[in-house]
Curated annotation (Swiss-Prot):
Disulfide bonds join 38-49, 42-51, 45-56, 50-61. Keywords: Disulfide bond, Secreted, Signal. GO terms for cellular component: extracellular region. Residues 30-35 form a propeptide. This peptide promotes cell proliferation (EC(50)=17.85 uM) and inhibits apoptosis (EC(50)=2.2 uM). It comes from the Eukaryota. This is Conotoxin phi-MiXXVIIA. Expressed by the venom duct. The cysteine framework is XXVII (C-C-C-CCC-C-C). The keyword Cytoplasm does not apply. Belongs to the conotoxin G2 superfamily. 1 family. It is found in: Secreted.
């Protein structure tokens, strides 16, 4: 009987982290944006879309300065 409750607890835990939480844990969803929302050459970064040539470092979009 104890094994059944352990199995039930694990199953409930696994189903509770699916969806948005699992995507956020895997880094696929960040700040409400997913990669599809940002476009092909952009990525979600700290709640905003960070596009090329900028880079996402520690959840912050670092804007590359233009050469001119």
């Amino acid at each position: 009987m104890r094994f059944f409750f352990l199995l039930l607890t694990v199953a409930l835990f696994l189903t509770s982290i699916t969806g948005d939480d699992a995507e956020r844990m895997l880094g696929m969803k960040e700040g409400g944006y997913v990669r599809e929302d940002c476009g092909s050459d952009c990525m979600p970064c700290g709640g905003e879309c960070c596009c090329e040539p900028n880079s996402c470092i520690d959840g912050t979009c670092h804007h590359e300065s233009s050469p001119n």
